[in-house]
Design a protein with these regions (language model features):
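Conserved catalytic palm subdomain of right-hand nucleotidyl-transferase polymerases, strongest
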Residues: 24-25, 87-95, 133, 143-153, ...
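Secondary-structure transition/capping motifs at alpha-helix termini
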Residues: 175, 204-207, 236-243
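Inter-domain linker/hinge segments that demarcate the starts of reverse transcriptase
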Residues: 74-82, 110-118, 163-168, 193-205, ...
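Conserved short loop/turn motifs at secondary-structure junctions
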Residues: 65, 94-103, 181-188, 215-221
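Conserved polymerase palm-domain catalytic core
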Residues: 218-253
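Surface-exposed loop/turn segments and immediately adjacent short secondary-structure elements
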Residues: 2-147, 152, 156-160
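Electropositive, glycine- and tryptophan-enriched low-complexity nucleic-acid-binding patches
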Residues: 162-163, 167-184
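Proline-centered turn/helix-capping motifs that create local helix->coil transitions or kinks
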Residues: 55-56, 123, 169, 173, ...
Length: 253
């Protein structure tokens, strides 16, 4: 892997860096926007609409949860930090994960202190709640914002806390997820499902049987999650109020 990365670096150094030109984009009325500032405003408008918060039917959760889950251990912070992939884009704070690796134990102690404070108060640092959105074009008209996939880049420090939180939630989610689910499962993947489909197709051909598949592609699936319903589902799953409050305060800005 390291040699491959060095190879691509030498190729980039030889041919130079490609800078994509920001082309025109359409506004909500279908008019072309060509000025950089207008394009930026349109993207801001689009992402705000895409990720707008549902402010209705809120639960009363202003109080800090005092019945806490077991405190975060330094070994959890170390594990989370080591599990973050290197050579990845930094979030809004611009701090690369490689810096934390260089600082070693000092980074672990510092992050542990901050994570412990978040754990107690359920209040996240504002920088940890910020995301940098990068639009990746999909198929279709490149002038339509809806034909882009928005990738959210968050700070590596925030990822440490999120990985710890995810690990704590895993014990609850594992008992709820069906065996047939391949995506977002440890030790499984959609490749396993593809292999199963290929095996089914092979057997259908072998025995000359008809076979039918239905593929559903939901538009903006992850962008359209109703958070109010999500909190209710977590409650039905008997996930602790403490963990739910941490997630809720992260999403409510």
């Amino acid at each position: 892997m390291g040699k491959t990365r060095d190879l691509f670096k030498k190729i980039r150094d030889t041919k130079g860096t490609f800078h994509a030109k920001m082309g025109s984009i359409k506004d909500r009325n279908g008019m072309d926007l060509t000025e950089t500032e207008d394009i930026k405003k349109r993207w801001q408008e689009y992402t705000e609409e895409l990720y707008k918060k549902d402010l209705h039917d809120r639960d009363n959760h202003d109080d800090v949860i005092t019945n806490l889950e077991p405190y975060i251990l330094e070994c959890e912070v170390k594990w989370a930090l080591e599990s973050i992939t290197t050579n990845k884009a930094s979030g809004g704070d611009g701090i690369p994960v490689e810096l934390f690796r260089i600082l070693k134990d000092d980074a672990v102690k510092g992050l542990h202190s901050i994570c412990q404070q978040v754990w107690k108060t359920q209040q996240w640092p504002q920088d940890w709640k910020k995301s940098v959105f990068i639009p990746i074009p999909k198929k279709g008209n490149a002038k339509e914002c809806s034909n882009y996939r928005t990738i959210a880049v968050i700070s590596h420090a925030s990822k440490v806390m999120l990985k710890i939180l995810q690990a704590r939630l895993q014990q609850y989610t594992n008992r709820e997820l069906p065996d047939v689910q391949g995506g977002f499962r440890k030790g499984r993947g959609t490749r396993d499902q593809i292999a199963n489909i290929l095996w089914i197709i092979k057997k259908a051909r072998e025995f000359q049987k008809n076979i039918y598949f239905c593929f559903m592609d939901y538009a903006n699936t992850f962008d359209c999650v109703d958070h109010n319903k999500l909190w209710k589902i977590l409650k039905r799953m008997e996930i602790s109020n403490h963990l739910t409050c941490l997630l809720r305060n992260l999403h409510e800005g």
